[in-house]
Regions:
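Charge-rich, well-structured scaffold segments of protease-associated domains
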Residues: 17, 75, 79-232
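His/Glu-rich zincin catalytic helix
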Residues: 1-80, 187-235
Length: 235
């Protein structure tokens, strides 16, 4: 990893790219009491159509990226949110049009928590039962969003600005679109976009950059993975 010093800001950041393609950024702050880690995939609500290395185009229902964000917390060992919380970390996630991010902060157990974060995001575990249950949960979230005037105005603006570009589609999807999502859909989209070459890890706080790199090397796959080709109409 190489260190870049930003003299005007009084800051320095370590950056490196692992052989598997993962970009890592670390801001060492030894005087801080907390550690913060952010792990993100360049995959979001507008990535509805893509082509994988077999050459075939896939059309996926609106809301898959957000649905995937919810379900990745489920692991064979239990719920990752509960595992991290039990180890003293505050954890959350979000899905935007072009990005899905998972993050935590805490004061203790950083190495273990970082390993957990990298593991549950990169190793999917879906069942038909859990997907069916999540459809009801997200449907309720969709209905709640319909009562949010700010959100309604935002998407009305996008629909007026774009006629075909998928950024006009709601990240969360609709009740009709999420009903089409299956465990196979989630596995396919995870395989297409959740590989190290399409992801970034950012860490800040009382941490050691070399230790962060070592954990990432140990937990994540060693290969970069094939990049899916996205279909984003020019508009």
């Amino acid at each position: 990893m190489e260190k870049t010093v930003y003299s005007a800001l009084g800051e320095s950041v370590w950056h490196g790219r692992l052989p598997n393609g993962l970009h890592i950024y670390v801001d060492e702050k030894p005087e801080y009491g907390k550690q913060f880690a952010f792990f993100a995939a360049c995959y979001g609500g507008m990535d509805l159509r893509f082509r994988t290395e077999d050459g075939h185009w896939r059309d996926t229902p609106a809301g898959v990226a957000h649905f995937l964000e919810h379900k990745l917390f489920d692991t064979e060992d239990g719920n990752a949110l509960q595992i991290l919380a039990a180890n003293g970390a505050e954890v959350n996630a979000f899905t935007a049009s072009s990005l899905t991010g998972y993050y935590f902060e805490g004061t203790d157990g950083f190495a273990e928590n970082l390993s957990t974060l990298l593991s549950f995001v990169s190793v999917p575990y879906f069942t038909k039962e859990s997907v069916d249950k999540e459809q009801g949960i997200i449907a309720q979230e969709i209905r709640m969003g319909e009562d949010n005037p700010d959100l309604a105005i935002y998407y009305m603006l996008l629909e007026a600005l774009y006629q075909t570009h998928p950024i006009r589609v709601k990240v969360i999807g609709s009740e009709q679109s999420i009903a089409q999502i299956t465990a196979d859909t989630l596995y396919e989209c995870h395989g297409a976009f959740y590989h190290p070459g399409n992801m970034v890890l950012c860490v800040a706080g009382n941490v050691d950059a070399k230790a962060v790199e070592r954990i990432a090397r140990n937990v994540l796959p060693g290969e970069e993975g094939a990049m899916a080709e996205r279909d984003r109409p020019a508009e």
